[in-house]
Every structure is written in C-alpha cells, then in structure tokens.
Amino acid sequence: MLKNKKLEFWFVVGSQNLYGEEALNAVKKDSKEIVDSLNESGKLPYPIVFKTLATSADEIKNIVKEINYRDEVAGVITWMHTFSPAKMWIAGTKLLQKPLLHLATQFNENIPWKTIDMDYMNLHQSAHGDREYGFINARLNKNNKVVVGYWKDNQVQKEIAEWMQVAYGYVASENIKVARFGDNMRNVAVTEGDKVEAQIQFGWTVDYFAIGDLVAEMNKVSQKDIDATYEEFKDIYILDIGDNDPEFYENHVKEQIKIEIGLRNFLEAGNYTAFTTNFEDLYGMKQLPGLAVQRLNAEGYGFAGEGDWKTAALNRLFKIMTDNKKTGFMEDYTYELSAGNERILGAHMLEVDPTLAASKPRVVVKPLGIGDKEAPARLIFDGVVGDGVVVSMLDLGTHYRLLINEVKAVKPTEDAPNLPVAKLVWQPQPNFKDAVKAWIYAGGGHHTVATLELTVEQVYDWSRMVGLETIVIDHNTNLRDIIKETSR
C-alpha cells in the first residue's frame, strides 16, 4: 500500500519594525493562537507550524530558503497582521519554489466600535496589509492561493484544508514515476505527449519497459504466494464463478494474482508509483492485466490503459491528493440520450478502479474480445454516487492543456447483467449537450481521471501552481466562451 508521507506547512506572519516591540509581541501572540486553534480544530489534514514574524527582507529571504530545502515542508501560509511593506517580500517571494497561501484574515472577528482608536487600527490592519502584499504577488505573477474570511470560520478552515491537499500533491508530484509496459496503442492520437516537457513542468518521470521485463518478474512468483492471496479473496470479494468450471475459474483468477504480485514487485524495485499497459503488447502473457491492475489501484498506484502515461501520472497525483479515496482511471464509453435523462457511462475493458466501488466487488472471469488472450478475471461493481470531476490532460504540440468537467455521479437506472465490466455513470455539468460540446471543442480525450474527492477549484489550483492552461466546464460555463478560449 502506497502511503503519503507526514509533511507540514509553515506559517509566516508579515509586519515591520515601525510598530515597536510591544506591538510585535502582540502580533506573535495572536499568530501562535491562530496556529494552535487551526491545528486543534481537527479540520486540517496536515499540521501548521508557526515559524516566524517577518519584519525585514533578509528575514523573509532566509525563511524562504529554508522552506525550499526542508523536505518535510509542503508549503507556506502567510498572514499580514499589520501593514508589511511589500518590497521586503520581493527577493524571498521570487525564490519560493513551494505552494503559497495568503490567508486574508484578521485576529478579531468584529470591530470594537465603542473603543476603537488608532492604536487598535495600527495593530489590526490586515485589510491594509493584504492589499500591499497581494500587489507584489500579482506583480511577480505568483500563482498563489488566497483564502478570505475569519480564521475560526468553518468554510475558511475547509478551504485551507483543501488547498493543503493540493499543495501536498504539487510537492509529491516530483516523485511520480510511471512505468510503461509496451508503447501507446497504435494509431491513437490523444494518448501521445512530450515526456520531457511533462518532467520539466510536472516533475513526472516516464520510463519504457518491454512486456518481457514484466513476464520475467511474474515467473519469479511462488505458487504459495498465489494460493495465499486467493484465500484472502474469499473475505474481500464475492467470488462469482458463474457458468465457468470451478477449476477453470480458479486458475484464471490465480493468473491475475500472479500478474499482480509480479507487477507490484517490479514497481517497488524501481520506485514506480504509476504504470500503463497495452492490449497490443502482451507477448508472453496469458491474460491482459485486469484484476491485477484493479488490486494495485486499490493500493494507490496510478494507472491508465493503452500506454496513456499522462493519465496514469495524473491518476497517481489525484490519489496522493485524496489519500486514494474515490479516484480512478476512467474512459467515456457510451451515451444515454433519452430526453431529460442524458448521461455518460464510463468504464474500460477491465481496469475500473475499486476505490470507486459502491458495493462489494465481484470477481468475474469472462472472455475479452480484444488482445487475443485467455479470458481474464476482473472486478465488477457499480460506481459510487455524488459530486465530482472528470479530468483530461492533452498535449497540443505547443503546450499542455487540462480539461476539468464538473459532474454528478448517479446510480444506473437499470441493471446491466450482461456487461462484464465495472462502471461509473455521471451527468456532466452544466448540462449534457453543452458539456459534451465544450469537451469536444477543447480537444478533451476519452481517457480521464474521475474523482469524487476533489473539487473543480482544487484541480484548478493545482493547474495554476504548475502554469498549465486549463479549461473548466461547470455550472458557470458559457459554450461560446469555451469556443473562443480554445480557438486562439
């Protein structure tokens, strides 16, 4: 099981020496109280550490250098308790290489109208400091996040928590390594991409391996380990033998277990956290990896089919952000076009992620009419319901583009007893026709990552961190604006 590391966020408060020691001591006291309260709220996924009260350019530059080189620091949260002249922030901000959140808050929620004087105004002037600090971030074209509101407010704490998830993903993205078993599916366009640019812009390492490398690792797997894993299945899944001979069923499931163990060992040896397969590159294998892929998805590995390394890496990135909850590789497959009930059925040949399962999956062995191999085992289930996004990344030759579509995953209106794959059904926003048109006009791929744990804003925040052109298709979308934006 892939686990997220324990990282932290530093809290840096801006002021200046003009206000005197007494005022600065009050600023420190208030800052520590805010940090302690946020940490004790139970709302944040990672701890905040009050690091310093910055009153000079040298202090700011030095703390930024430390933020950059300390591996345990995922990002920085800044707050302007008072006015902090922004020229002091230029050198440090230019050096900053990690995510930045500007918390536009104030220590006191209410203005004390009956007692307010200039001493109070000088100490509590976040409105003044926010604008000076915001200007320099805009001038430096810093893709920072701004959260506004009272620091005890539930919504403010929720926004900080959601940004933390994204910031963690941004930092961890540098360690994403994708193993490609075989090349891209022949003649498919949208799964191609510039791997060098992806490593420069997103930090992703993408390596190719012949399928024989995986087969060699599979051949090292012991029958004892295969049998032990099969026994575990009896508690985890529904073993649905169907019309199969019991021995035939068990052997075909165990072949997927052999693939799973071999794959895991290969990935662990090379520190790979995502991978791709291709049904056209299966020499030496008895089955296309199906159940094996799904089992590794459940452990946090990113995946995409047909050699689509961009989607595999994006999948792993979102699994990091969501702690591997309700997130997986998806493919737009078929439409429901009945008036007023339009929706999209997403699935894949085999490899639908079980973190998206709404119920206990069934292990099924059915023939696969593609790849020319034995009938593979796979998990079958209906997908979860709720609000989420589907996200696609494409290479336009001159640059990468990200598409984010807000969706509502829904329960299928009928059973599909003859469909031998897991599925997720969703209604795209703002409505079916405009969403599909916008997706097609913008060049969106058929492969996506579907997640019910991230919001449009979170994915958009990440895209800003990496300087990625992004098209959002949601309840605010105007189709003409999308066409105009994508026709430049």
UniProtKB/Swiss-Prot annotation:
**Reaction equation(s) it catalyzes:** beta-L-arabinopyranose = L-ribulose
- Might you give the EC number(s) for this enzyme? 5.3.1.4
Chain ranges passing through the membrane? none
Q: Does the keyword Iron-sulfur apply?
A: no
Choose one Gene Ontology CC annotation of this protein and give it. cytosol
Residues annotated as binding Mn(2+) are 306, 331, 348, 447
Family matches, as NCBIfam families = PRK02929.1
The entry's function note states: Catalyzes the conversion of L-arabinose to L-ribulose.
Q: What is this protein called?
A: L-arabinose isomerase 1
Q: Which organism is it from?
A: Clostridium acetobutylicum (strain ATCC 824 / DSM 792 / JCM 1419 / IAM 19013 / LMG 5710 / NBRC 13948 / NRRL B-527 / VKM B-1787 / 2291 / W)
Q: Which gene encodes it?
A: araA1
